[in-house]
Design a protein with these regions (language model features):
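Conserved P-loop NTPase motor cores
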Residues: 75-77, 81-96, 103-106, 292-428, ...
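P-loop NTPase motor domains
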Residues: 44-64, 131-133, 155-364, 440-444, ...
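Switch/coupling segment of Walker-type NTPase motor domains
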Residues: 71, 80, 87-93, 104-206
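Flexible loop/turn segments at secondary-structure boundaries
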Residues: 78, 97, 124-128, 145-147, ...
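Basic- and hydrophobic-enriched, low-structure N-terminal and domain-boundary segments
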Residues: 1-89, 481-482
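Conserved beta-strand scaffold positions in the cores of enzyme catalytic domains, especially
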Residues: 137-139, 283-285, 398-400
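Loop-rich catalytic cores of soluble enzymes, especially ATP-dependent carboxylate-amine ligases
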Residues: 29-30, 41-43, 49, 96, ...
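P-loop NTPase motor core of the ASCE superfamily
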Residues: 165-218, 380-482
């Protein structure tokens, strides 16, 4: 029998055996309450800290302890210092709540003055949320507007307000982004990489167009016209030595590829001036749900163009802020279904990386959404596969929902998972049970559940539950309702 320090016997936790001993077969757990440190500070030694992050957007509760968990890439980087890069990757099979998690984070950040930008919303998952936050929704697709990839957008308007090196840097950045976009669209459409000479020809032609046309007026039609005319800055790169036939042979492939972009659905989307410019005066969603899932090439092209325009507008806004001409702003950008663009053609990993590589000083948090890492390692070349995995490796942290068991080996190459963590996330991928009485499926075991992983640190298993207005604005199955 144990004894108290004073020598008094301490009864067993179930009481003494025998008559009058108070023996019980069940000992109930003590009741628990949660409150702030200020409220519970006088209850020592009965209070215990939860140990979960309390900085950022409240996303749910720790599955093990019930403690509140706060998480978002902006606050975890900016205020908590938990991650080295303000970005996150969300992984999980369809139907587990990836879009709802991103929507919860976007809504919370919007309340803190961080503008959510969704440049390429396929279903759309976030249009209702954007409207509820007072933002704007731009529609693109077949018969729903055009996006001119040669339009410098906000960059030229911002450059006119700048001087010196700041002006030159922004103009050079705008030229580089347009060059990347045209090269990416050509590579995507021809399903072959753009050569270094072709890229130099595009850059020279863009410079000629900038000198001849007001910002936003030149389109891919005029770009083909410059290649056809062959002005000296362009002709010089072909080493034609005054031979017109040699020049025609040198530009024929590129001219044909850009000309192909002007035909059919591609032409409807990219051959004219921009219908609705992206104005970053608040939350923004670009709804491209009008493009059918069967038109994968057009879908990937429009997504890529939207990303390019959005990142260009962000760069212009930050350049004005750095010069003291506008207030400093923070953005949260969501790249959903990223794999659709990466697998659309060889070399597009580099193009996407060039468009999205914003450093920590530019005030941009980012969420990249995949189904599984197999989306990245199923690309055509080993070089592309290696570079694509870098998107997950460089992310500040991962939010892992239910994934198949076959995914664990790939995940282990990116982040350290313990045995119990691996078992947990694979159990979330199990199919739902069947309610024989109601004749319907029960909720899937992994819905709303995520494991937050930062490098080799122990993961935080979180259960997210939608509340109040979220139930309506984050409903991704609207078309199935009667």
């Amino acid at each position: 029998m144990n004894h108290h320090p004073t020598g008094t016997p301490v009864p067993p936790r179930r009481g003494y055996a025998g008559r009058g001993g108070g023996r019980d077969f069940y000992v109930s757990a003590p009741p628990e309450w949660r409150a702030t440190t200020a409220q519970l500070c006088g209850l020592w030694p009965f209070a215990a800290g939860s140990g979960t992050p309390m900085v950022g957007v409240p996303v749910g509760r720790d599955i093990r302890t019930g403690a509140t968990v706060c998480s978002d890439p902006v606050n975890w980087f900016r205020r908590a210092g938990l991650i080295a890069n303000p970005s996150m990757v969300v992984l999980g099979i369809p139907g587990v709540g990836k879009s709802k998690l991103v929507g919860r984070i976007a809504t919370g950040l919007a309340s803190q003055g961080v503008d959510p930008i969704i440049p390429g919303d396929l279903k759309p998952d976030h249009a209702d949320m954007t409207l509820a936050l007072g933002g704007r929704v731009v529609q693109l697709g077949r018969g729903q507007g055009c996006l001119n990839v040669l339009d410098p957008g906000a960059a030229m308007a911002a450059a006119q307000r700048l001087t010196g090196d700041a002006r030159r840097r922004l103009i050079a950045d705008s030229l580089g982004r347009r060059l990347t976009m045209v090269s990416a669209l050509v590579a995507l459409n021809r399903r072959a990489v753009v050569t270094d000479v072709e890229e130099a020809l595009i850059a020279a032609a863009l410079t000629v167009l900038d000198e001849k046309f007001p910002p936003g007026r030149a389109t891919l039609v005029e770009l083909v016209g410059v290649l056809e005319a062959g002005p000296e800055p362009v002709r010089r790169l072909t080493l034609d030595r005054g031979d017109d036939e040699r020049y025609r042979a040198a530009v024929h492939g590129l001219q044909s590829s850009i000309g192909a972009l002007l035909q059919g659905a591609m032409g409807d989307s990219f051959a004219h001036t921009t219908t609705t410019p992206m104005v970053l005066d608040g939350p923004l969603d670009v709804d491209i749900s009008g493009i059918g899932a069967s038109d994968e090439k057009l879908q990937a092209a429009v997504m890529l163009a939207c990303w390019g325009e959005a990142f260009g507008a962000i760069a212009a806004a930050q350049a004005l802020a750095d010069a003291g001409l506008e207030r400093q702003r923070l953005f949260f950008i969501v790249l959903d279904e990223l794999w659709r663009v990466l697998r659309a053609g060889p070399g597009l990993v580099d193009r996407v990386d060039a468009l999205t590589r914003l450093n920590r000083q530019e005030g941009v948090g980012m969420a990249m959404v995949f189904h599984t890492l197999k989306d990245l390692v199923s690309l055509g070349t080993e070089e592309d596969r290696t570079k694509a995995k870098g998107f997950a490796e460089r992310a500040g942290y991962l939010a892992i929902a239910g994934v198949p068991a076959a995914e664990l080996a790939l995940l282990q190459e990116v982040v350290s998972l313990s045995g119990p963590e691996g078992a947990l996330i694979t159990s979330w991928a199990d199919p739902p049970s069947w309610d024989t009485e109601q004749q319907r499926e029960l909720e899937p075991p992994g819905r709303g559940r995520f494991l937050f992983k930062i490098g080799g640190r122990p993961g935080i298993p979180v259960q997210m539950t939608l509340v109040g207005p979220e139930l309506g604005i984050h409903d991704t199955n609207k078309k199935w309702h009667g």
